[in-house]
Amino acid sequence: MEMTVFRTKVQRAVSEALGEEYSVELREVQKNNGVILQGLMIRRAQENMMPTIYLNSFLKAYEEGATFADIIRKIVTVYREDAVGKQIDISFFTDFEKVKDRICFRLINRDKNRSFLEKVPYIPVLDLAACFYYAYDGNGVQNGMIPIYNNHMSAWNVTDRELFACAVKNTPRLFPCDIMPMESALEELLEELQADVRQHLAREIPMLILTNAGKTYGACCILYPKVLEQLAKRVDGDYYCLLYTSPSPRD
C-alpha cells in the first residue's frame, strides 16, 4: 500500500476510534539530511500537547502481515500511554530570560538540510551547521526538544551569535561528553564472543566513540571546549573524526 493511501486510512480510523473530542492531523516532518517522515498528530480538546507518532514503521509492519486493526490499536495505545492528560505551559517560551539557560545546539549537514536551514538561525561550522533548540525536561516529558526558528529569534530580539554563546555554555553542562572505546559501545553485541576474540577486536580496531551523556546529537561534542585536545592526548597522536548523524523517529 502506498504511504499516501495508508496515512489517510490511518487518520480516519484513529479519528473514529478516539471520537469527536480528539483532533487527528497528518504532518510531514523533516528530519536530518533531508529525510521526510510521515507523522500523525493527535490532540484532545483543552490539551495543548500534540505529540507526533511516525507512521513509517507502522506501514512496514502492515506490509509484513500485521492487520490494519492491530495497527490502529497500537497507535491509540501509544498515544494514550504517552500523552493523555499532559499539559505543558509554554508561555515561558516568549521570554528569552526564561529560556536562555537551556538553549543548546546540535550539528547537521548544511548541504542536505538547506530547506530546514532557511527557517532557523544557525552558525556555519565547516560544511556543517550548528542550529539551536530548547532542551525541555519537565511535566513527565524527558529529553524533550523545542526547535528554535527565525521567528523565535526575532521575538526575543537576539542574534544568532547570542544564541550560540548561550548554547556553547549550556550544551556541555546539560549534555556532558562521553568518550568510550568502540568495544564498550558494542558490548552487548560482543558479549557472546569469547574473551580472546573481543581482545583481538579491541587491538585491531582501536576506535573511540565521542558522544554525550544523552546519546543524542553527540556530534556536537566536537565543539565542546578542549574535547578535541582531550582526544589527541588519549590517542597520543593525530586522528580522524568521523561524524555520524541519523534521524531518531518515534518508531
What are these language model-derived features?
Residues 1-63:
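N-terminal ordered "arm"
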Residues 10-18, 22, 75, 79, ...:
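Hydrophobic, Leu/Ile/Phe/Ala-enriched alpha-helical segments that form helix-helix packing faces
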Residues 24, 237-241:
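A short linear hydrophobic-aromatic micro-motif
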Residues 40, 44-207:
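Charged, alpha-helical interface segments at or near domain boundaries
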Residues 207-215:
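Short glycine-/aliphatic-rich beta-strand segments at the starts of folded cytosolic domains
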Residues 216-220:
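Short, surface-exposed ligand-recognition loops at beta-strand->loop->(often short) alpha-helix junctions
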Residues 221-231:
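Short amphipathic alpha-helix segments
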Residues 244-249:
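Conserved small/polar residues in nucleotide/adenosyl-binding loops
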